[in-house]
Amino acid sequence: MPLLHKIAGVVIVCAVVLGLALPGERGGGRDEGKAAERAGAASRTPAEARAAKAGRTPAPGGSGTASPTASATAPIAAAAPAAAAAKANELGQVPVLMYHRILKKPELSLDRSTKELYDELTRLAKGGYHPITAAEFVGGRFTVPAGGHPVVLTFDDSTPGHFGLDAQGNPKPDTAVAVIEQVARENPGFRPTATFYLNKDLFGMDDVQAAAGLKWLRQHGFEIGNHTVTHPNLAGMSEKGVRKEIGDMEDRIAKLTGAHTTTFAYPFGSVPKKEKWAEKQDGRYGFQGMFLAGWRPSTSPFDGDFDRWKIDRVRSEGKIKENDCKRYCSTAWLDYLDKHPDERYTSDGDPNTVTFPKAAEDRIAKQYRARARTY
């Protein structure tokens, strides 16, 4: 989809400048002060970007979360010695990486080569990162070994370079899924999973192939997400148009898989006039998390500032001049987090607890306070 990729590049740049891709108040209230704050985010250093509060809404309670009636002032229990030794910080930032076409030889600015994908995933594996799905991230229930770091791998537009099955029923060589599985084989402990956000052209497959392919992905631990039928800019569409784009795609996914999706990624990162149009339509779709096309890691799902309706992502790219990738794309952010490990999400190894340094106690979302542990 060359034209879409060209448009995507332009829209993402505009989003950075205008602050459209950065999180803000849910459901309105965008006064001039807020707009100025978001517009300035593009010129901040990574540290400044993290420090700037965006007024997000709390994360939703997931399975095992604290009761809403739990006291917000109750003392937080001490962390396990092993968690403290691992320097766990489960209020740290989480990279949610955004990929588009995967090709042997990139053609457009958003493309990544199979080698670039392999090298980046290998870097993640060697750096102690462990992939989780977008749904697991949003729900705040995932398992990462103590001392490790979660990362969410997302692939937009369901292009042929993402996935396909050969005659033997195995992932086709040089596709994203094949590369992910190769890196997992070479790096024990690196979980082979990712989230694929689908448009109508399902990896270049017909409906029979798509049904088999989507079944294979789900059976092997990959997540399927909604990305609309035709990848339009939802910001300029009517309620009817927004619901048709999302609902028709959801109908097709449900027909092919027998299941509904949990998460949604905005095409171009563009939010419609009323966010509720995209979030839910009774009897048709209802998402638990919505992903943007932003330029910084996400806040932890346990942080009181986490907004599940506007989750930041980072474009996969090296430190190139285009779109200020020297500072805001994946290589730059991974370098930054390596140099500032205290700002990165580091797991305590126990999915039933949320461990962090005592100095960060005021940041824990109230619904997770009963699971909190400090040191």
Task: Give the role of each language-model region.
Residues 1-26, 40-44, 48-51, 55-58, ...:
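C-terminal active-site subregion of NodB/CE4 polysaccharide deacetylases
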Residues 31-41:
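Juxtamembrane extracytosolic/periplasmic "stalk" immediately C-terminal to the first targeting helix
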Residues 89, 144, 180-191, 205-225, ...:
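Acidic (Asp/Glu)-rich catalytic clusters
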Residues 95-98, 130-134, 152-153, 176-207, ...:
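Short, well-structured secondary-structure segments
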Residues 199, 229-230, 269, 295:
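Histidine- and/or cysteine-centered catalytic micro-motif in compact active-site loops
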